[in-house]
């Protein structure tokens, strides 16, 4: 690089830092990439049992600034997901539905220390474009686009309950903490519309009414960590700074009511007719557990996680993911 240009850049950065408030002189930017898979088994008295297998890839970024007792941040993510739904009749498969989804989300949050814990308030927007296809190459039905949009706002309080640490003169220091959390979230789902088509043309138009829901969550987290001091030489700089393992368990409850779904066909025809059905309210209670492990370096982190959840007696799911994230500084 040009020495003069390098010096000018350093001088500009120093001058900018001198004139900016201390709160924005160190603004971390976190970027990440993750991949995961999930399997969901559904069995209800009103429909045939089915299994959904999904694979997803997510890219996310966050900008956070603040001080010791408060934080303000913006987060965004983009997820592409492929799903394979298999309906079953006994031991034989009857029908498969392949689908893809592109999902974007953005969130603004404020996090502040409340007593010995932390409270977080957020506003979140999520939009997804779903595509469906079922059948063989020549005889099939497909829905090219079903746009879904969700707005939500929530509050989460986290409280450390017990903690301990042990210092080591020759090896890594150790620490552990047990925390509890509780939160409440309001969600609004916009109307959605899509058309099933065959090679001959439109078959059915689906219109889903808007809906609202309130979700509550409560649970606990146990975290244990090993802390490594930076050493001399190349290995001392690149070795991990922290290894941690955590176990999270939570109980979630959702109250949302039913949602009307209108089915119209043939779409746009002179003989079109409409039928209004009611989508059942989701299961009221759901529990989930997650086991996670992470390796942290000075400016990056690698995370592994696996989870299992159950909603009532009809929905069981399990999955896992791996994520790599990096920390950058704007200034």
Predicted regions located by residue number:
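Secretion/assembly modules of Gram-negative surface proteins
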Residues: 1-120, 124, 141-331
């Amino acid at each position: 690089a040009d020495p003069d240009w390098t010096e000018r850049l350093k001088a500009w950065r120093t001058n900018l830092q001198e004139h900016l408030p201390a709160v924005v002189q160190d603004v971390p930017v976190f970027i990440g990439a993750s991949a995961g898979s999930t399997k969901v088994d559904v069995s209800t008295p009103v429909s045939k049992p089915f299994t959904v297998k999904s694979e997803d890839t997510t890219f996310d970024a966050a900008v956070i600034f603040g001080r010791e007792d408060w934080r303000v941040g913006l987060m965004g993510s983009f997820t592409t997901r492929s799903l394979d739904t298999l309906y079953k009749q006994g031991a034989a498969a009857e029908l498969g539905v392949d689908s893809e989804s592109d999902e974007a989300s953005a969130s603004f949050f404020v996090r502040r220390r409340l007593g010995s814990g932390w409270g977080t308030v957020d506003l979140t927007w999520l939009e997804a474009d779903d595509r469906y296809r079922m059948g063989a190459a020549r005889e099939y039905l497909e829905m090219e686009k079903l746009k879904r949009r969700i707005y939500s706002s929530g509050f989460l309080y986290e409280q450390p309950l017990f903690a301990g640490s042990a210092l080591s003169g020759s090896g890594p220091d150790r620490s552990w903490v047990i925390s509890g959390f509780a939160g409440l979230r309001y969600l609004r789902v916009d109307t959605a519309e899509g058309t099933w088509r065959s090679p001959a043309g439109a078959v059915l138009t689906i219109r889903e009414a808007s809906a609202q829901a309130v979700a509550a969550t409560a649970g606990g987290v146990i975290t244990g960590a090993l802390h490594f001091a930076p050493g001399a030489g190349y290995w001392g700089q690149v070795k991990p700074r922290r290894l941690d393992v955590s176990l999270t368990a939570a109980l979630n409850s959702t109250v949302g009511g039913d949602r009307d779904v209108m089915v119209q066909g043939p779409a746009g025809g002179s003989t079109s007719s409409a039928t209004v059905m009611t989508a059942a309210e989701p299961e009221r209670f759901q529990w989930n557990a997650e086991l996670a492990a992470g390796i942290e370096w000075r400016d990056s982190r690698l995370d592994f996680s696996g989870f299992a959840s159950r909603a009532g007696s009809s929905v069981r799911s399990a999955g896992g993911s791996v994520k790599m994230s990096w920390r950058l500084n704007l200034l």
